[in-house]
């Protein structure tokens, strides 16, 4: 779902992105953020268990940090790839509100990647990571020059804007 959000915001220039169904009952719903399991369907108050999915956490890499009023800013990769190639490798987008810059990086590759984010006014950024075993986990402040991206991950990097 992170790739869909990225492409909607960067290629289609969507100004907002919404998820219509948060809680779903049953296994036949393929796009569940919060699936409800074990319920007889009569009452959410007395039975059933709500769990989270990776779709929820990858959506959170955007929704917790890219806030209303932010605007997308230009990201210039040092290499040239088509939109199709980017959708199957690395996707990067950045947003600002004048106080901070939020960058979301999707590593869709099967291998770990090391990238450099060039920022004139900051050397480090706060990194939040979603992987197969991490759910929007705060990874501390990381150097922007050698940012480690695990395979099949979504990272959000927050830098104070000066």
Regions found by a protein language model. Give the residues of each.
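Aromatic/acidic polysaccharide-binding cleft in carbohydrate-active enzymes
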Residues: 1-66, 71-81
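Composition- and surface-driven signal marking solvent-exposed, interaction-prone regions
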Residues: 4, 32, 74, 97, ...
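A general structural signal for short secondary-structure junctions and capping/turn motifs
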Residues: 6-11, 93-95, 119-120, 146-149
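Active-site proximal loops enriched in glycine and acidic residues that flank catalytic Cys/His/Asp
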Residues: 18-21, 77, 105-108, 117-119, ...
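Flexible loop/turn segments at secondary-structure boundaries
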Residues: 24-29, 111-113, 135-138
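Carbohydrate-binding surface patches
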Residues: 81-123, 152
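Solvent-exposed beta-hairpin/edge-strand motifs
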Residues: 119-136
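C-terminal beta-strand-rich structural cap/linker in extracellular carbohydrate-active enzymes
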Residues: 140-162
């Amino acid at each position: 779902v992170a790739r869909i959000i990225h492409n909607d915001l960067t290629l289609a220039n969507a100004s907002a992105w919404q998820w219509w169904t948060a809680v779903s009952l049953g296994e036949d719903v393929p796009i569940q953020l919060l699936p409800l399991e074990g319920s007889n369907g009569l009452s959410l108050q007395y039975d059933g268990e709500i769990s989270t999915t990776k779709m929820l956490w990858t959506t959170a890499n955007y929704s917790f940090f890219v806030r209303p009023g932010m605007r997308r800013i230009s990201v210039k990769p040092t290499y040239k790839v088509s939109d199709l190639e980017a959708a199957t490798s690395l996707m990067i987008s950045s947003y600002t509100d004048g106080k901070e810059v939020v960058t979301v990086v999707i590593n869709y590759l099967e291998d770990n990647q090391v990238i450099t984010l060039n920022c004139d006014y900051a050397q480090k950024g706060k990194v939040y990571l979603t992987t197969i075993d991490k759910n929007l986990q705060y990874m501390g402040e990381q150097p922007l020059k050698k940012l480690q991206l695990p395979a099949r991950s979504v990272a959000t990097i927050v830098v104070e804007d000066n």
